[in-house]
UniProtKB/Swiss-Prot annotation:
GO terms for molecular function: exo-alpha-sialidase activity; host cell surface receptor binding. Residues 1-26 are intravirion. It is a single-pass type II membrane protein. Residues 234-239 are annotated as: Involved in neuraminidase activity. The keyword Signal does not apply. This is Hemagglutinin-neuraminidase. The gene is HN. It catalyses: Hydrolysis of alpha-(2->3)-, alpha-(2->6)-, alpha-(2->8)- glycosidic linkages of terminal sialic acid residues in oligosaccharides, glycoproteins, glycolipids, colominic acid and synthetic substrates. Belongs to the paramyxoviruses hemagglutinin-neuraminidase family.
């Protein structure tokens, strides 16, 4: 029995010894594992340079900085992508479209000329320098945000004078008309040898030219063809337009004073003429007895015409024969336009009565003075398919001199402020089926003209008068949706007298800093303005052709005043020049 007990005790001792060695082994393994792990962590921290806990605190900051760098890089890349998109999707197609338009205009002009050459009617293909491609007849400044009057004219720039001046003290050059297409420009004025008041004898100067850039980068107007119509005809109130066949001109032929003409019983003789690219001039009488059968006097608007849809469009005005269909359809019609923030205090009924009377001023025997638009098909045959549009007097004021303008895809009629309303007016015009429709006008309250009382520059109430002066505005600044924002022009900055010509940019209520021709006492008269861009330099220029007093050689000298349009912020009414 003792032996059995000893055997059991021995087995227990062996089992206990095994458990002890197992524990020692496990502890050793665990110790080695911990040591190995500690060495590995130490090595890793050493290799990362993060040997202290304070280094770990900076890790989030470093991550944030890295994130900012990545975001900035992505943002820069996005800017590049945006610029590429703008260039590819917007600017390049627009540039191509402008180039295409100019090429198509040139091709159209050439096709007309080829047909003309086949009919022995001349040959030639003038075109502006490439620097101007896409910069003529376009929306030159498209800006939704800037103050319109932050754009302003520079001082007048010296350039080549393309307009002949009087050469004697009794000479007189007056009534300039100008129009410029994508390929060439046209200019005309009246020449009187014995003083500006001679209404029976005159010549008509007519010229065709192109825009050039000099070797030093200066703009100049280069006359290629010109003619002085020195014959027995007395052309008056001529309007000119640049068309694919040259320079089309509409004139009346006067044999009496304006007052005598309005008191006559028959319409005024009118001719459609053309200076071709070959330098030859031809003209044809219009059938005024049919075209102006209800009129006793009819004159072109003096301002330039416009080539639209294969036709040339001119502003015309004159007197209607009483009780004819054209006269009776306007009976009782009127429109009242109001000054900005300066309401007429007269009773409404009185205003309406005076507005109605304004269309029949006493100076012209009580005839209704009517606005109209004449379009003529442009072909090798002059005077082809003339169509007269007479707009309702619920839109237009008393008939007056005017101009048809095309800028981009928009058409406008400027109407001289011969009636009571002093601020410049531009009527939007739509064209369809050879006729035109006028819409409510843009008005430019600070772009006034001098006039006799009660229709002076500050006048605000309807009245009957024949006054004012021709000073057209040119559409310069547009919204991106093609709505007109601002114009450029040269106004006569006087209340009653034709004094102080001053150029500026105008919005509907105010004007920019101005550039004066000279002191406030200088005498002036008609001004007509046109703007364009030198695409190569992205500089915008405006040309104002102005009648300026010139007492030594003739009563007036017609001067082409050239300015660059500059940009400033918050500057108004500064004096320059």
């Amino acid at each position: 029995m003792d032996r059995a007990v000893s055997q059991v005790a021995l087995e227990n001792d062996e089992r206990e010894a095994k458990n002890t060695w197992r524990l020692i082994f496990r502890i050793a393994i665990l110790f080695l594992t911990v040591v190995t792990l500690a060495i590995s962590v130490a090595s890793l921290l050493y290799s990362m340079g993060a040997s202290t806990p304070s280094d770990l605190v900076g890790i989030p900051t470093r991550i944030s900085r890295a994130e900012e760098k990545i975001t900035s890089t992505l943002g820069s890349n996005q800017d590049v992508v945006d610029r590429i998109y703008k260039q590819v999707a917007l600017e390049s197609p627009l540039a191509l479209l402008n180039t295409e338009t100019t090429i198509m205009n040139a091709i159209t002009s050439l096709s007309y000329q080829i047909n003309g050459a086949a009919n022995n009617s001349g040959w030639g293909a003038p075109i502006h320098d490439p620097d101007y491609i896409g910069g003529i007849g376009k929306e030159l400044i498209v800006d939704d945000a800037s103050d319109v009057t932050s754009f302003y004219p520079s001082a007048f720039q010296e350039h080549l004078n393309f307009i002949p001046a009087p050469t004697t003290g009794s000479g007189c050059t007056r009534i300039p008309s100008f129009d410029m297409s994508a390929t060439h420009y046209c200019y005309t004025h009246n020449v009187i040898l014995s003083g500006c008041r001679d209404h029976l004898h005159s010549h008509q100067y007519l010229a065709l030219g192109v825009l050039r850039t000099s070797a030093t980068g200066r703009v100049f107007f280069s006359t290629l063809r010109s003619i002085n119509l020195d014959d027995t005809q007395n052309r008056k109130s001529c309007s000119v337009s640049a068309t694919p066949l040259g320079c089309d001109m509409l004139c009346s032929k006067a044999t009496e004073t304006e007052e005598e003409d309005y008191n006559s019983a028959v319409p005024t003789r009118m001719v459609h003429g053309r200076l071709g690219f070959d330098g030859q001039y031809h003209e044809k009488d219009l059938d005024v007895t049919t075209l102006f059968g209800d009129w006793v006097a009819n004159y072109p608007g003096v301002g330039g015409g416009s080539f639209i849809d294969s036709r040339v469009w001119f502003s015309v005005y004159g007197g209607l024969k009483p009780n004819t269909p054209s006269d009776t359809v306007q009976e009782g019609k009127y429109v009242i336009y109001k000054r900005y923030n300066d309401t007429c205090p007269d009773e409404q009924d009185y205003q309406i009565r005076m507005a109605k009377s304004s269309y029949k001023p006493g100076r012209f025997g009580g005839k209704r003075i009517q606005q109209a638009i004449l379009s003529i098909k442009v072909s090798t045959s002059l005077g082809e398919d003339p169509v007269l549009t007479v707009p309702p007097n619920t839109v237009t004021l008393m008939g007056a001199e005017g101009r048809i303008l095309t800028v981009g895809t928009s058409h406008f009629l400027y109407q001289r402020g011969s009636s009571y309303f002093s601020p410049a007016l531009l009527y939007p015009m739509t064209v369809s089926n050879k006729t035109a429709t006028l819409h409510s006008p843009y008005t430019f309250n600070a772009f006034t003209r001098p006039g006799s009382i009660p229709c002076q520059a500050s006048a605000r109430c309807p009245n009957s008068c024949v006054t004012g002066v021709y000073t057209d505005p040119y559409p310069l600044i547009f919204y991106r949706n093609h709505t007109l924002r601002g114009v450029f022009g040269t106004m006569l900055d006087g209340e009653q007298a034709r004094l102080n010509p001053a150029s500026a940019v105008f919005d509907s209520t105010s004007r920019s800093r101005i550039t004066r021709v000279s002191s406030s006492s200088i005498k002036a008269a008609y001004t007509t303005s046109t703007c364009f861009k030198v695409v190569k330099t992205n500089k915008t220029y405006c040309l104002s052709i102005a009648e300026i007093s010139n007492t030594l050689f003739g009563e007036f000298r017609i001067v082409p005043l050239l300015v660059e349009i500059l940009k400033d912020d918050g500057v108004r009414e500064a004096r320059s020049g």
